[in-house]
Amino acid sequence: MKLWGGRFKEEESKLMEDFNSSLSFDKKLYYEDIKGSIAHVKMLTNQNIIKEEEKEKILLGLEEILKEIDEGILKIEGDYEDIHSFVEINLINKIGNVGKKLHTGRSRNDQVALDMKLYAKKSTEEVIECLKELMDSLIKVGNENNYIMPGYTHLQRAQVVTFRYHLLAYFEMFKRDEKRLENALEILNESPLGSGALAGSTYNIDKEYTAKLLGFRKPVDNFLDGVSDRDYIIELISKFSIIMMHLSRLSEELILWSSSEFRFIQIGDAYSTGSSIMPQKKNPDGAELIRGKIGRVYGDLISILTVMKSLPLAYNKDMQEDKEPFFDAKDTVISCLKVMEGIISTLKVNKENLMKSVKKGFLNATEAADYLVNKGMAFRDAHKVIGEVVIYCEDKNSAIEDLSLEELKQFSDLFCEDIYEFIDYKNSINKGIKKEMGYF
């Protein structure tokens, strides 16, 4: 049974039926589809479009279908065109002809637009919750490991920071991601139900009622836009892509830091794997997979952008292709956030190796230049002097703080005994605006 066919003389080919069907993936929307239908039926009764007793039968049937799906009694499978057909046909089979009144004053166009918006809202809230859990772990692990470490530019050791402060940089990234998603929720929070196929309905549909009942801020203002808007899907996948980019940056650093060349951290066994041939190997596969899965989400974004390119108003069947990219992007970003939270919450930090790397990289060179500036030298001249000091140290295989005062005075008479206190790593990180890094 189809929800259409009266104007056709010939049957749809089996090839076209299979090609046209979306049940295999839009079955994810069963909950939203049934909840939308419940709201629609209540509105139809309020507007005296269907009778009270008809409403009760339809509602009971819909609730039974929802319960049977949730309990695994009713399988979402079979020769149905989509989830809307599945629900409506099963409703008719369950309660009889009164079920045929469910779709009064509604099109699958505004129905699927509603389903996707409800699903997008729920999915976005899930992603926000995962972001919050990861941010909490970043703060907790950072506070537990507030150790001095090298900060990098160009992947070269640059200046002293702390492990805590480094993690807090990612906290800020994910905090922006959270704000972006909250803003997206506000924009998409308009109900398309009542838009019909593209031009509303001759029935006195109360779209404000259904919008409120379903938790939307308001109904859409334009019917054509209501059924054809997929901006929110593009926007959300775009924001998911930014989250994945942030996760990939963090993953890359964790992979580097856990390597034998760095040994800054140890990723827990629970988020590592081994080798089938090399017994000694402990691979950071969790972080590597997160880094790799960014390609999926970027691909999902390009997919939906391409689907929507040049589409005329209003609904077009191309829009059926909006679902799989969104479902995939949402599932991917949630799984990656959860795995990253697990990696962060269980990693171990090697305080000693962090400090060893600090001492090998002339990370107090900028502070040494600042010292000369405080003694009256212009910064550009101080920069040149300390550059020469670094060359001298490299030739001696020494650190700036290990040079004698006599050696330092070869480069400038401004050097005094207090230079050593000034360029001490623990002291320098608590000077000036550096205090904001919160080393304690």
From Swiss-Prot:
An example molecular function term from Gene Ontology annotations: argininosuccinate lyase activity
Keywords tagged on the record: Amino-acid biosynthesis, Arginine biosynthesis, Cytoplasm, Lyase
Location(s), subcellular: Cytoplasm
Biological pathway: Amino-acid biosynthesis; L-arginine biosynthesis; L-arginine from L-ornithine and carbamoyl phosphate: step 3/3
Pfam family, one: ASL_C2
Protein name per its UniProtKB record: Argininosuccinate lyase
Leader peptide range in chain numbering: none
